[in-house]
């Protein structure tokens, strides 16, 4: 009888922990990236519109990624290109860079960005909820820790897939086509405000090889959280 009661209590406790744990619930969907949005900055050249929308501030970052990325040293910028001209253009990630006070910010892959920021925040939330169960956590920790670990791994995988799905990939941009996605960069430690931040990129015209340049300067951004 005691074993049966312990089993039921363990199941109840594990369910309570998972129910209380903050799940990964971003407010942005992939389909929304292709729609026209209000950018932070926009520039046009050779019939191609290039816009950048910041997701560095805490409110926008939490909307898109359910976490304050900048507090973990990750900068997310949504880049959108729309070809309103008559030529085909190639867009390569290697031709894009983020600059701040004259220094290039290192690229982060979607997986690295996810691991550095959101998965860390989720693990912290999960542990906090687990410990918050008090003495029950001590009594049943082998079962709750095992279940929590499995659950966390599942959520971490979903977070990584989300970051990858929303990331910007190089593409051939034909007339009347749109390319859009997030680029992730590593921020220096301890920043509270981003100043002199810009995104520089080149696109390559397929027919002639001409390479229009874009430099989009963003306003100062408060990332103090």
Where are the regions that the model predicts?
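Conserved functional micro-motifs across diverse proteins
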Residues: 21-225
